[in-house]
Amino acid sequence: MSSKHKRRILNLPLKLVLTQEGSEFFIKQNRKLMKLKLAEHVEDYGIALDAFAPKTVQGLLLSGYVSLIEVSPPEFASSRQEIIDLSKLIVHSILYRQYDCYVFRQILNSEVIKKWNRSNPGSSIDEHANLNAPFIYNHLKQHEAHVTQIKHHILRLLHASLAACEERTPKEKNTLLFLGEKFLDTLRPFTWFIISKFQHAPDMGSVLSSIHTSLAQYLNKARIAEYIALVLVELLINEENTNLKKEVQKLFPDLEDAQEALCDEGIRRRIVAELKHNAESLFISWKLQGRSVSTAGTRRKLKITVYGRNDYPQEMRNCLQDAKVVNADTDTLVDYCQQTIDTAKHANLGVYYISYLSEACKEANVRFESSLNRFTRSEFTTVDLSFEF
């Protein structure tokens, strides 16, 4: 459950387009917003970061301050792990917010709060309750030990259910316990205020049981994050490799094997620099819903777009549209990745992985669609992955 293996700083340039609330927050902090140049020659206002602390970006996401994140590093292959980490951070942040809203709504609809509101109509508790932040903070500070005890109780329930699951490895169980703790830590302070205030109420046990049950459901959704990350990096690296080989053929027409040439660090650096100079980089963006996603009961939407410069053959287009490339019943996506990484170096594994991603989304009740588009006036071929959590 330790976070010691998590990176503190990710060296990956980011462009963050802000929501209205995000813009207002930065303006109040006397932070000047930048006009960002995005893919497809789109311009919008936000902030740009050369490197970032995951905790900082996650804080902006949890506050609903970010509507779009875009990256376009000079070379994706050398940024593979950073892209995986960023993608997982974004998906987890979406799920943290959704879980927070779900738990808050469950508590407000519980018998504990209904009884209180009937007995105390003048100080009823609902989403509009006027309790200022310092008051809640002081209350939680005074009852910090009780809140910690309640969290540990929920985590013990989670640990017991994971221990009974023979399908998961010890490593997977530890990861899920760590994620479970993160889900609980990102619940809004008002939620913990209510739980601590009514911890001895007769019906609070059923509330805590509901929190544990829903936590298990969201942890099942959270495994989608790794699948998405694997799909993305394979799509990106395939796109980039094709892009680099085209440039090799332009600059070194006498070379017979463009792929072998890219193994030469000097040639590769020159090719990457040339593409950057000609503004022929690739892009990837994560588009989130705005502040409205905090509304209870609303499914969270995420659209990931890979902007490439290579056209796909029709069979690959069909695969993306149908998401039926391989038998997704045999292994998990991670297993399939390990089995094929050495034997399919030149295949677009990302397209094949989409089959596994689609199946995993169905099992976790996550709506998923994939499509490939090439518009007449656009310089890009886009692969779109759309999710409703």
UniProtKB/Swiss-Prot annotation:
Domain of life: Bacteria
Protein name per the record: Uncharacterized protein TP_0466
Organism: Treponema pallidum (strain Nichols)
Taxonomic lineage from the root: Bacteria, Pseudomonadati, Spirochaetota, Spirochaetia, Spirochaetales
